């Protein structure tokens, strides 16, 4: 079987042609299988984002009866997404959450999605792999945590998903050097600035990798470089589970139950096994029976659900006998530095992360910090650009001048690997949401290593922009990309799930989202979350074939 035939066999969704004249296959949604609550299905998945959708697709293809419940809507790109920053806030999880700590993390568009497709609906499309060193930071660098899985064990799933999305980019020289199935996209003005400045400083930079079609891919068109990747990608050139793995799962018999808020996981007090999930849909409380449960609500909602599922058998919260649920939550430091140029740059005219470098990713004994950071182009649209400028104290006439000058600015962003710490965690607050459930409280504080990384990344970005010819630079401090909160570990005293994402406490409960990642890395986490879920699905299907309950 050739490579293309193999991809076709694994994920036919890329070749499903629209059958009603729209980019969304409405027939698949209309005619999808629907289970009754009283049906004891094989698996119910909570959340249908990066991890939940891959698990759904893999297991449905293996013949399992699976339903995924998502708290948000089933998006239709034709009607729900617009080329408008202000008109896209409905894509984000904006329910109440509390933040605390010495360096609190604002919640919203940069780290929370709501709806089928999850946060990948509004991510920038950047899909790098983690490095081999990310899996052994405790052993090699003396910080962070070692994963109970290795990079070689995850590599086959990276390769599968890079074909399925697909990913476009130049050959990647860092970490485990590798190529990508699609050629890199043309470089826009922002990327040209980065490449020019990096070359003058002797810093290697490359184009990609992005999960954005470069050329037609099935029923998905070529990217038109419109700049609205973070608003859903109305043309469907950018891959997300909504247009890749979810349609394929529906075509093979899955059910996706949108606008279904799961409130609690039920556990048999006698056997200690999960029996299904309580959820609310259309204002009614319901219960879906299942032989197995997988949680994929991401790093805030997954710990919150586990803690809200306390019972007499698990009084401190489900899977929380050793006080691990909610701990070791991580973000990446994500400062952004912009530079002004006499010539027009028009940074929005390309995929936002078009050029990047991982030259500073690994620990360097000559630096005063452990681990590292990556740098990539970012392309704030006008409203976000106004926020950048206002953060510098500019207002009124000065702000208007910066806005008029928008097309002359280039912007770079760093992703700094902040370290996992047990005190950075999700707990339950006294406040309740509209369902009567305690809301999540996320407490976060940086350590000295985190701050040193951020300073170093800012300096490198400023140097690159000055080397490229910028006559002014400005920097804002940000966070990006939640992971952790239900991490995988070698034993239950140090984590919530094992190397296969199976919980230590409840034998038929899995967690398959970013909350299981033990470390953050300096790479965007979407592809790694999908790869971890694909590996868990492989384990489940192999175990079922071998008679393992």
Q: Model-found features: residue ranges?
A:
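Extreme N-terminal leader/targeting segments of oxidoreductases
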Residues: 2-43, 61-62, 542-549
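Glycine-rich loop(s) and the adjacent beta-strand/alpha-helix scaffold that form part
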Residues: 58-61, 65, 72-77, 81, ...
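A glycine-rich dinucleotide-binding beta-alpha-beta segment and adjacent secondary-structure elements
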Residues: 15-16, 40, 207-211, 217-229, ...
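Redox-cofactor-proximal catalytic regions of oxidoreductases
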Residues: 87-174, 363-364, 422
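Conserved redox-cofactor binding core of oxidoreductases
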Residues: 12-20, 139-262, 482, 487
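FAD cofactor-binding and catalytic pocket of flavoenzymes
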Residues: 104-110, 147-151, 320-440, 494, ...
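A conserved FAD-binding loop/helix module that cradles the flavin
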Residues: 519-538
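N-terminal Rossmann-like FAD-binding beta1-loop-alpha1 element of flavoenzymes
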Residues: 43-68
């Amino acid at each position: 079987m050739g490579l293309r035939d193999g991809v076709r066999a694994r994920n036919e969704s890329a070749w499903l042609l629209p059958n009603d004249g729209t980019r969304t296959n409405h027939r698949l949604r209309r005619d999808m299988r629907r289970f009754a609550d009283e049906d004891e299905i094989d698996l119910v998945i909570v959340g249908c984002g990066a991890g939940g959708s891959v698990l759904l697709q893999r297991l449905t293809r293996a013949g399992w009866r699976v339903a995924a419940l998502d708290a948000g809507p089933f998006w239709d790109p034709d009607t729900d997404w617009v080329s408008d920053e202000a008109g896209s806030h409905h894509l984000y999880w904006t329910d109440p959450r509390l933040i605390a700590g010495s360096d609190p993390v604002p919640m919203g568009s940069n780290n929370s999605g709501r709806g089928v497709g999850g946060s990948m609906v509004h991510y920038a499309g950047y899909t790098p792999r983690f490095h081999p060193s990310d899996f052994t930071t405790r052993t090699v660098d003396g910080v962070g945590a070692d994963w109970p899985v290795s990079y070689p064990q995850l590599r086959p799933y990276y390769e599968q998903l890079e074909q399925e999305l697909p990913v476009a980019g130049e050959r990647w020289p860092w970490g485990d050097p590798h190529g990508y199935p699609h050629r890199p996209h043309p470089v826009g003005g922002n990327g040209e600035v980065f490449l020019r400045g990096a070359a003058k400083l002797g810093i290697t930079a490359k184009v990609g990798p992005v999960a954005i079609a470069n050329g037609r891919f099935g029923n998905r068109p070529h990217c038109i470089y419109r700049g609205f990747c973070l608003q859903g990608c109305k043309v469907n050139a950018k891959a997300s589970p909504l247009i890749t793995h979810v349609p394929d799962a529906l075509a093979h018999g899955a059910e996706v139950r949108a606008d279904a808020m799961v409130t609690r996981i039920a556990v048999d007090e006698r056997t200690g096994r999960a029996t299904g999930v309580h959820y609310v849909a259309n204002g009614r409380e319901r219960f879906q029976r299942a032989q197995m449960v997988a949680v994929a609500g991401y790093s805030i909602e997954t710990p919150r659900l586990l803690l809200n599922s306390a019972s007499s058998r698990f009084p401190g919260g489900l899977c929380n006998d050793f006080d691990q649920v909610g701990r070791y939550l991580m973000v990446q430091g994500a400062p952004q530095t912009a530079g002004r140029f006499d010539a027009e740059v028009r940074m929005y005219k390309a995929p936002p992360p078009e050029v990047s470098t991982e030259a500073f990713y690994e620990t360097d004994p000559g630096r005063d910090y452990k681990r590292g950071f990556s740098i990539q182009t970012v392309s704030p649209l006008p409203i976000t650009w106004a926020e950048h400028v206002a953060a510098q104290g500019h207002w009124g006439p000065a702000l208007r001048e910066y806005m008029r000058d928008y097309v002359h600015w280039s912007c770079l962003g760093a992703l700094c690997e902040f370290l996992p710490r047990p005190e950075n965690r999700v707990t339950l607050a006294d406040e309740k949401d509209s369902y009567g459930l305690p809301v999540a409280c996320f407490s976060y504080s940086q350590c000295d290593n985190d701050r040193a990384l951020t300073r170093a990344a800012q300096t490198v970005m400023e140097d690159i922009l000055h080397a490229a010819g910028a006559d002014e630079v400005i920097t804002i401090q940000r966070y990006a990309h939640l992971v952790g909160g239900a991490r995988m570990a070698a034993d239950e005293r140090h984590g919530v799930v094992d190397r296969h994402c199976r919980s230590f406490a409840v034998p038929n409960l899995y967690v398959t989202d970013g909350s299981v990642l033990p470390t953050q890395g300096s790479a965007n986490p979407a592809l790694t979350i999908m790869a971890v879920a694909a590996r868990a699905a492989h384990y489940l299907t192999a175990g079922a074939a071998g008679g393992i309950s």
